[in-house]
From Swiss-Prot:
Entry keyword Magnesium: no
Organism name: Pseudomonas putida (strain GB-1)
A Pfam family of this chain: Queuosine_synth
Protein name: S-adenosylmethionine:tRNA ribosyltransferase-isomerase
Main localization category: cytoplasm
GO molecular function ontology, one term from the record: S-adenosylmethionine:tRNA ribosyltransferase-isomerase activity
Gene: queA
Length: 349
């Protein structure tokens, strides 16, 4: 399979650069996996597609204000994007500067704060701050909006580029499928008899990195930390026992659950994952998926194609463009049921 198989034309006007007035105000494109049939709905209509006894699995990671601006003590402006918090004072970060800081260099943070560059790990810099990292980021950090939202972050992004159920700080990108849910909709879902469970996957900036190989089988995924607790395993077993479906909210929830079931058996898991899901890979846990519209040639589009089938996914994306759906993080959503016999690009006539 080639990366180019997952390309499509997207007008710039369809890239959502701001959230809608209401979280639930998005549109919902429903793709029936077994038939490929499409339905054009509004996001609250998701209720019509959920059944009593289903289990929705959400990612409760919390986006940290991971972008910092500052300068080297020796002079020269720079930008820091925290990739991973290592402990209370140390992070791994991307540093953008005219000249990369050397080990021992001191970084002065705009708004107050100081860090030392203590090591370099390939493209990432290990920084040690003089004060606790998370309070510092909350005080002077900026929300790390994706590169395709080409505007400075605004005060509203602190709330809207965050799910209402976010708990565990550590992500530098939002699990965007969850942005559509407000408390009122969650209450209606619960009232219908749909259970919920929470995993954690701290989304890294690598989620926006382009695939730089021709054959997707040659691509190596970035690592992200996740946790699937025993409570989630128990909830899924109970869901199966009552005949319910496991509905993953977002590709990060899919990657969490499928990482914890790599040998075909779901087990509690905590640690790094570099799982890469593309057409041909089986799914062991997830039956249905809520997800946003993803970038052309992205690993997330490949995951959706593995779940729904390649021709069905690309046809759905073509329909979304034709009908003016809004794309990417602040855009519209899909609800997809798993295709029991998904085809890949190589299966096309």
């Amino acid at each position: 399979m080639r990366v180019a198989d997952f390309s499509f034309e997207l007008p710039d006007s369809l890239i959502a650069r701001h959230p809608l007035a209401e979280r639930h105000g998005s549109r919902l494109l429903v793709l029936d996996g077994p038939t490929g049939a499409l339905s054009h709905r509004q996001f609250p209509d998701l209720l019509d597609y959920l059944r009593p006894g289903d289990l929705m699995v959400f990612n409760n990671t919390r986006v940290i204000p991971a972008r910092l601006f500052g300068q080297k003590a020796s002079g020269g402006k720079l930008e820091v994007l925290v990739e991973r918090v290592l402990d209370s004072h140390r992070v791994l970060a991307h540093v953008r500067a005219s000249k990369a800081p050397k080990v021992g260099a001191v970084i002065l943070i705009d708004g107050g704060g100081e860090a030392e560059m203590v090591a370099r790990h390939d493209t990432l810099f290990e920084l040690r701050f003089t004060e606790e990292v998370l309070p510092l980021l909350d005080r002077v950090g900026h929300m790390p909006l994706p590169p395709y939202i080409d505007r400075p972050d605004e005060g509203a992004d602190r709330e809207r580029y965050q799910t209402v159920y976010a708990q565990r700080a550590g992500a530098v990108a939002a699990p965007t499928a969850g942005l559509h849910f407000d408390e009122a909709l969650l209450e209606k879902i619960a009232a219908k008899g749909v259970e919920r469970a929470f995993v954690t996957l701290h989304v890294g900036a690598g989620t926006f990195q382009p695939v730089r190989v021709d054959k997707i089988e040659d691509h190596h995924m970035h690592k992200e930390w996740l946790e699937v607790g025993q409570d989630v395993v128990d909830a899924i077993e109970a869901c199966r026992a009552r005949g319910g479906r496991v509905v993953a909210v977002g590709t990060t929830s899919v990657r969490s659950l499928e990482s914890a079931a790599r040998d075909g058996v779901l087990k509690a898991f905590s640690g790094d994952t570099d799982i890469f899901i593309y057409p041909g890979r089986p799914f062991h846990v997830v039956d249905a998926l809520v997800t946003n519209f993803h970038l052309p040639e992205s690993t997330l589009l490949m995951l959706v194609s593995a779940f729904a089938g390649y021709p069905e996914t690309m046809a759905a994306y073509a329909a979304a463009v034709e009908h003016g759906y809004r794309f990417f993080s602040y855009g519209d959503a899909m609800f997809i049921t798993r295709n029991p016999a998904p085809r890949g690009p190589e299966d096309q006539a």
